[in-house]
Amino acid sequence: MAQRDYYDVLGVDKNASESEISKAYRKLAKKYHPDLNHEPGAEEKYKEVNEAYEVLHDKQKRAQYDQFGQAGVNGQGGFGGQGFGGFGGQGGYSSQGFGDFGDIFGDIFGSAFGGGRSRVDPTAPQKGQDLDYTMTIDFMDAIKGKKTDITYTRSEVCPTCDGSGAEKGTHPITCDKCHGSGVMTVTRQTPLGVIQQQTTCDKCGGRGTIIEHPCQTCHGQGTVDKKQTLQVTVPAGIDNGQQIRLSGQGEAGKNGGPYGDLYIVFRVKPSKEFRRNGTTIYTEAPISFAQAALGDKIRVNTVHGPVDLTIPAGTQPNTNFKLRGQGVPKINGTGNGDQEVTVKVVIPKKINDKQKEALVDYVKAGGGNISPQEKNFFERLKDKLNGE
């Protein structure tokens, strides 16, 4: 059976950001994990989700997959149909080598994986969540770059309680149920045997502390939502779906941790005149039959302004010309890409008697020295001249 597209497996767009991919994976991994879902096909679906995430969350593998499809990642990973065993590392799922897989499964199962990583101290400083912002820009703004202001909403440290969540003059107290750990250990019987699972403390909600007198401004959250206005520099040469990171412009951290980052994802409007592929610009230029036959110098629009293009005598329809350095600026390099111009020979719909006579004489003078392509052209020209 043919493998499904990895983006379809996770239910995300091909231009999805890393955070969107991780969010989709977390949701599906929890939904289809064999210990949580005993429906037929859940395990196979779970393997498929893991395989898709393994490729798409890795920038190098994702780039190979985007360029070559399944052939670009064959033999580079996947889960190989391994079973799930238990969680003690005896043939079961292992998070080694998969980056934030362990964090994701920690969200689903706590520390149920035997020998897994210890849970983060809930009272330790934690970086805030990253945010995504989609910016739609015009085609030429993507080529030349610009500065523009954006306004978005993010959480900021509460100015009243300085992020503690407690009313001024009071402090959060250690939770007496979990003793500040934020988790409770629960023993349960499963088809795999008896396992101990750490779950979020139901008294403090995993914070490790309890706020007896909540701050009236943030209602005990430690953060408040505020609108933020930033000036964003759009890099010259940015392409549709690409993103930039603004450090420290995301959500507020916890327990004095740093702010998260803001990712600006660009959506570029198409142009009516130009088409783009990477750093190359494509456009068309109409020329007359006489210009194609005799040669000429024409003005061609580029993304940097009009330039002269020399048309050699005998130019054939749909001939491509390259204008070096007239393409898109290279973001991670110097200079510009190129522009490719395709000339379109335009046959006039109406001509006067003198023009008609001259063209008929030209056709007659050509004799049998007409290539099949030229013959095709002249047959269409005769039809035009004869009013057919």
UniProtKB/Swiss-Prot annotation:
Main localization category: cytoplasm
Free-text comment on the cofactor: Binds 2 Zn(2+) ions per monomer.
GO biological process terms held by the UniProt record: chaperone cofactor-dependent protein refolding; DNA replication; protein refolding; response to heat
Annotated binding of Zn(2+) 1, by residue: 158, 161, 215, 218
GO CC terms in record: cytoplasm
Location of this chain's protein in the cell: Cytoplasm
One Pfam family of this chain: DnaJ
UniProt cofactor(s): Zn(2+)
CDD domains: DnaJ, DnaJ_C, DnaJ_zf
Subunit structure: Homodimer.
Listed NCBIfam families: DnaJ_bact (TIGR02349), PRK10767.1 (NF008035), PRK14276.1 (NF010869)
HAMAP family: DnaJ
Described function: Participates actively in the response to hyperosmotic and heat shock by preventing the aggregation of stress-denatured proteins and by disaggregating proteins, also in an autonomous, DnaK-independent fashion. Unfolded proteins bind initially to DnaJ; upon interaction with the DnaJ-bound protein, DnaK hydrolyzes its bound ATP, resulting in the formation of a stable complex. GrpE releases ADP from DnaK; ATP binding to DnaK triggers the release of the substrate protein, thus completing the reaction cycle.
Domain notes: The J domain is necessary and sufficient to stimulate DnaK ATPase activity. Zinc center 1 plays an important role in the autonomous, DnaK-independent chaperone activity of DnaJ. Zinc center 2 is essential for interaction with DnaK and for DnaJ activity.
Record-given protein name: Chaperone protein DnaJ
Organism whose genome encodes this protein: Lactobacillus johnsonii (strain CNCM I-12250 / La1 / NCC 533)
